[in-house]
């Protein structure tokens, strides 16, 4: 059994969107981004058991299938597979830093990842590793990575969900890129977000988070020490919870 320290560490879940993993020069992965994130993960593992839900948008998005003239179902399936590719890349980077991780998948791909068959699969992965990477979404088409994020947060009994946005530092009353009068919201409750249709994540995922009393922290993933500052309540971020 893996033991990085003797104290009981709470679990957190980090969402890494596929769009944030890439470079503007059309390369699917940004090495600088991964190095920056991993340096922060090294610090986090001393205090937390870290779960990571990873998207696939740097490779393909399920809802963009029309431009390829393929059925939406196939587009979603390709999106699911893309998250496994991204998860494996992250695991390879963690291996390069001698950090112990497990890649779990909601779909069967035994040569790459351990399929999530039960709660015991998840608990065992956390017991034996510093980081658990969740790929394959929910395993079903038409469900977003947000839904997978909420599901894994509930399953892991996470104390917080950290959602790193690409170039956005939290939640606003409107899209700040389109509305100069948009107001930044440092704190927010679920009911207000739903009532005002703030579109933080899809409603299925958001409702699951609300019903399970999960705390969500939204921040700019590209900011310096973004993960560490968000957890330590430094810098600019939005906290969403029931109150």
Swiss-Prot record:
Binding positions for UMP per the UniProt entry:
56, 138-145
Q: What is its EC number?
A: 2.7.4.22
The cross-references to InterPro entries, in alphabetical order and at most eight, read: AceGlu_kinase-like_sf, Asp/Glu/Uridylate_kinase, Uridylate_kinase, Uridylate_kinase_bac
One GO term in the molecular function aspect is: UMP kinase activity
What are the record keywords, sorted?
ATP-binding, Cytoplasm, Kinase, Nucleotide-binding, Pyrimidine biosynthesis, Transferase
Keyword Methyltransferase present in the record's keywords: the answer is no
| SUPFAM superfamilies in the cross-refs | Carbamate kinase-like (SSF53633)
Which residues take part in binding ATP?
Answer: 15-18, 57, 61, 166, 172, 175
* Activity modulation: Inhibited by UTP.
RNA-binding as a keyword of this entry, yes or no, is no
Which pathway is this protein engaged in?
A: Pyrimidine metabolism; CTP biosynthesis via de novo pathway; UDP from UMP (UMPK route): step 1/1
Per its database record, what is this protein's job?
Answer: Catalyzes the reversible phosphorylation of UMP to UDP.
Q: What is this protein called?
A: Uridylate kinase
User: From what organism does this protein derive?
Assistant: Mycoplasma genitalium (strain ATCC 33530 / DSM 19775 / NCTC 10195 / G37)
Gene it is expressed from: pyrH
């Amino acid at each position: 059994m893996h033991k990085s320290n003797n104290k009981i560490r709470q679990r957190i879940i980090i969402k890494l969107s596929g769009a944030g993993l890439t470079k503007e020069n059309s390369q699917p992965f940004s090495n600088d981004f991964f190095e920056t994130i991993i340096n922060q993960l090294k610090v986090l593992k001393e205090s937390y058991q870290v779960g990571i839900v990873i998207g696939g948008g740097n490779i393909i998005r399920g809802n963009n299938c029309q431009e390829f003239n393929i059925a939406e179902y196939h587009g979603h399936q390709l999106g699911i597979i893309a998250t496994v590719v991204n998860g494996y890349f992250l695991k390879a980077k963690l291996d390069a830093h001698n950090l112990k991780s497990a890649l779990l998948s909601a779909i069967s791909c035994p040569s790459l990842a351990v399929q999530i068959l039960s709660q015991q699969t998840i608990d065992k992965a956390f017991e034996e590793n510093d980081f658990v990477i969740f790929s394959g979404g929910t395993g079903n088409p038409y469900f977003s990575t947000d839904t997978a994020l909420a599901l894994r947060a509930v399953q892991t009994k996470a104390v917080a969900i950290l959602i790193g946005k690409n170039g956005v530092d939290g939640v606003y009353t409107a899209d700040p890129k389109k509305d100069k009068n948009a107001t930044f919201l440092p704190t927010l409750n679920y009911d207000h977000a739903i009532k005002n249709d703030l579109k933080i994540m899809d409603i299925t995922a958001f409702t699951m988070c609300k019903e399970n009393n999960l705390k969500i922290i939204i921040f700019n993933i590209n900011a310096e020490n973004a993960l560490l500052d968000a957890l330590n309540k430094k810098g600019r971020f939005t906290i969403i919870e029931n109150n």
